[in-house]
Amino acid sequence: MGEMDQYGNVNVSHLNGNLIGPGGFLEIAQNARKVVFCGTFDAKGSKIDVTPDGLHIAQSGQIPKLVTQVEKITFSAAYAQQSGQEVLYITERAVFQLTAEGVELIEIAPGVEIERDILPYMAFRPIIRHPRLMESSLFMPMEDA
């Protein structure tokens, strides 16, 4: 996932002025019943530690990926809504879901605080109802896994 915007659109093909090309992404993503985007919350320079208490964001990346409007729409949230697709956006810090009302924050990682580690690094405010905690076993240090 290169960028996601406040509407749930995703850009995977045109990042920072570089044309990458979507390949077969369009055919697969637009025709699937459920689409799960996975990627980091931000890019370039983030430093994240896995501790027994969960994630510790020592430094956020320099390039935000949750933006007001994507540079190019490779995945259309409006089309997904019209076709009844279920859409999830998974990052190490949070999980978002596309709803009829917009992008909703549905899960956060252990150790992450919404006001400290998520909202200041997003260009929009997602719908926040009752986000649950991600499964803590997902964040075990590699030597313990």
Regions found by a protein language model. Name each.
Residues 1-144:
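Conserved phosphate- and dinucleotide-binding cores of soluble alpha/beta proteins
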